[in-house]
Regions:
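Glycine-/small-residue-enriched transmembrane alpha-helix faces in small-molecule transporters
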Residues: 1-42, 79, 151-180, 198-201, ...
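Juxtamembrane helix-entry segments on the extracytoplasmic side of multipass membrane proteins
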Residues: 4-9, 33-41, 64-71, 145-170, ...
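Helix-helix packing/entry segments at the starts of transmembrane helices
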Residues: 15, 39-42, 82, 86, ...
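Alpha-helical transmembrane segments of compact multi-pass small-molecule transporters, enriched
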Residues: 17, 22, 46-50, 104-119, ...
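Specific transmembrane alpha-helical segments of multi-pass solute transporters/efflux pumps
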Residues: 22-23, 52-105, 142, 229-247
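Hydrophobic/aromatic residues within transmembrane alpha-helices
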Residues: 29, 39, 43, 92, ...
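Transmembrane alpha-helices of multi-pass small-molecule transport proteins
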Residues: 31-84, 109-115, 167-174, 188-209, ...
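Hydrophobic transmembrane alpha-helices of multi-pass small-molecule transport proteins
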Residues: 51, 55, 109, 115, ...
């Protein structure tokens, strides 16, 4: 592994660690009285405004994609990586446990690999890669359960969590042709824009946005939202788009397995939640599985299957 490739891996790891922390900070916002849809909307508004401001200073700034085909692709990214993904994940928490949701949503690298492999021949998993993926999934189970081997099945909640999982898998597929044509700033700005645009029907028909809740927000809540909007959304989505182009969609998406590891570490640090030996064993299995699944004999070609 070259020094530059190692750098890409370290940056990807950092992004996923930050995303893992967002569950803890989102939980704090939920306890403050904000709804899941409000949290998503506010963090994406912050991210979009800042990224738009930066984009306007660039000589290469453009408002629209070169064709409606690519504009629709951007809309698809905004839905699958923005509004629909976050709504499905957060609504799942209303019907099922955090454990179930984490297990299902964070298994998305497996589904993303299978979906991408159906369109890109060079990305299809070999036996060693599939073994590594399964080892990582076992590690994921151990990390999320953290010594409490009890699952409470909920058809509605688990279906919503699986829907969020599939959304991120589709997002990982759609980002490949987008990266071939546009830079990370343009793509990420479009993701935020269409994510916000497509959340509007939810507020019109399901749950109106409670503007009065904004007036009651404390400085601590605003700082929390700024972290989610500036760091976890604007910076992390921007960097994630970039590293998916550099490492390949499957390699980058495999890092999602680390997401619950980061979540539990932050929960231990900020919420005094325990860490067990099962968590440590699961972490080792996740890292081992990721190493095996990244052992590829061919480069990540970007040619679509005809």
């Amino acid at each position: 592994m070259s020094g530059r490739t190692l750098y890409y891996h370290l940056v990807t790891f950092l992004v996923v660690v930050i995303w893992g922390s967002t569950f803890v900070f989102t939980k704090m916002l939920l306890l403050s009285g904000l709804s899941p849809a409000q949290i998503f909307t506010l963090r994406f508004i912050i991210a979009y405004v800042l990224l738009m401001g930066f984009s306007l200073t660039r000589s290469s700034h453009r408002w629209m994609a070169a064709s409606w085909r690519y504009e629709l692709l951007m809309a698809g990214l905004g839905v699958t990586g923005g509004s629909l993904y976050f709504l499905a994940e957060n609504e799942a928490l209303r019907y099922t446990t955090t454990t179930n949701t984490s297990l299902i949503v964070c298994s998305c690298p497996l589904f993303a690999s299978l979906l991408i492999g159906a369109f890109y021949r060079s990305q299809r998993l070999g036996r060693l890669q599939m073994l590594g993926m399964l080892v990582a999934v076992v590690g994921l189970v151990l990390v999320v359960l953290n010594g409490h081997f009890v699952l409470h099945l909920s058809p509605i909640g688990d279906t919503l969590a699986f829907g969020a999982c599939l959304c991120w898998a589709v997002y990982s597929l759609l980002i490949i042709p987008a990266n071939q044509r546009y830079d990370a700033v343009f793509i990420t700005r479009k993701v935020f824009f269409y994510g916000l645009l497509t959340i509007v029907p939810y507020f019109l028909w399901v749950e109106p946005f409670d503007v009065s809740a904004l007036a009651a927000m404390t400085p601590a809540v605003w700082l929390n939202l700024l972290y989610l909007g500036v760091v976890a959304s604007m910076l992390c989505f921007l960097v994630w788009t970039w590293v998916m182009d550099k490492l390949g969609a499957i390699t980058a998406t495999n890092y999602v397995f680390i997401n619950p590891v980061s979540t539990i570490v932050f929960a231990w640090w900020l919420l005094d939640e325990p860490i067990t030996p099962w968590f440590l064993l699961g972490t080792v299995l996740i890292l081992s599985g990721m190493y095996l699944s990244d052992r590829r004999n061919d480069s990540a070609s970007k040619s679509l299957v005809e």
